[in-house]
C-alpha cells in the first residue's frame, strides 16, 4: 500500500473521529509532558495545512512555532476544514508526484504525505490514550508507514524527524506496535 491521498484520507478520518468524540473537559488533558490535547490538534492542523500550501503555492514553509489559537472557537471545524482542503488538493491529477520548494531544497509531496499519514495516526493514538479511549490503527496503514520510514532512513538518522530514541519493540510485535515504538510510543 502506498501512502497516497487515499491513505491520508483514511488517517485523517481516524484523527477526526478521535477529536470529534472529545468532551469540552478533555481538550486540556495532558498528552505528554509538553503537549495537551488541544496543542496536539493544533500541531496536526498546522502540519496538514502544508499539504494544501504545497499543492496550491508550490512550497512548504517550515513550522518552528505554532499556537493553539489557530484552531479558533471550534477546533473540530477548523480541523475538518483543513483536512477537507488537503483531501481536495490531493485529488488533482499528479498531486502526490509533485515536487515543491522547501527551505532544505526540493521536497516531494509523496514524502509529505508519508509524514502526515504517520502524524495523524500516532497523534490520534496519543489523544485516545490521554482520554482513555484507545484508537485502533489499521494494520495496513501501520505497515505502509513503516515501509515509508524504512525508505527514509537517512532522514530519520539525521534527527528531528522521529524521536531521538525510539522504543525497541518485541521481536514478535505487530505493525502497529512497531510503528508506535518507532515514534517513541509504548
Feature map (PLM): residue ranges:
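Structured surface interface patches that mediate subunit assembly and partner/cofactor docking
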Residues: 2-14, 21-31, 36, 53-71, ...
Amino acid at each position: 500500500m502506498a501512502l497516497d491521498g487515499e491513505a491520508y484520507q483514511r488517517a485523517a478520518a481516524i484523527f477526526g473521529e478521535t477529536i470529534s468524540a472529545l468532551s469540552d473537559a478533555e481538550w486540556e488533558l495532558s498528552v505528554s509532558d509538553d503537549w495537551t490535547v488541544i496543542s496536539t490538534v493544533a500541531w496536526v492542523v498546522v502540519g496538514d495545512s502544508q499539504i494544501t500550501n504545497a499543492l496550491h503555492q508550490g512550497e512548504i514553509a517550515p513550522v518552528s512555532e505554532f499556537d493553539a489559537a489557530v484552531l479558533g472557537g471550534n477546533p473540530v471545524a477548523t480541523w475538518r476544514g483543513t483536512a477537507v482542503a488537503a483531501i481536495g488538493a490531493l485529488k488533482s491529477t499528479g498531486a502526490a508526484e509533485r515536487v515543491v520548494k522547501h527551505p532544505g531544497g526540493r521536497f516531494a509531496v509523496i514524502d509529505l504525505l508519508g509524514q502526515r499519514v504517520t502524524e495523524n495516526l500516532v497523534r490520534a493514538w496519543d489523544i485516545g490514550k490521554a482520554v482513555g479511549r484507545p484508537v485502533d490503527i489499521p494494520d495496513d496503514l501501520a505497515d505502509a508507514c513503516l515501509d515509508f520510514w524504512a525508505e527514509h532512513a537517512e532522514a530519520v538518522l539525521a534527527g528531528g524527524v522521529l524521536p531521538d530514541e525510539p522504543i525497541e519493540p518485541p521481536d514478535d510485535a505487530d505493525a502497529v506496535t512497531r510503528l508506535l515504538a518507532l515514534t517513541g510510543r509504548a
